[in-house]
Amino acid sequence: YVSQRLCGSQLVDTLYSVCRHRGFYRPNDGIVDQCCTNICSRNQLMSYCND
């Protein structure tokens, strides 16, 4: 995974791919700002995966 800007369905699809069976939650703290407005790293995406 290369850090990149992800928006809309591309962001959701990438979260499914990164989190796999753990799933992910819908945070209120700005995933769109982190990953759509700015460039998002794999570690940033993984922080939204369920434990």
Swiss-Prot record:
Cellular location(s): Secreted
PROSITE patterns: INSULIN
One Gene Ontology term from the biological process aspect of the record: glucose metabolic process
Pfam families from the UniProt entry: Insulin (PF00049)
GO cellular component assignments: extracellular region
Disulfide bonds: C7-C36, C19-C49, C35-C40
InterPro entries: Insulin (IPR004825), Insulin-like (IPR016179), Insulin-like_sf (IPR036438), Insulin_CS (IPR022353), Insulin_family (IPR022352)
Protein name: Insulin
Organism: Myocastor coypus
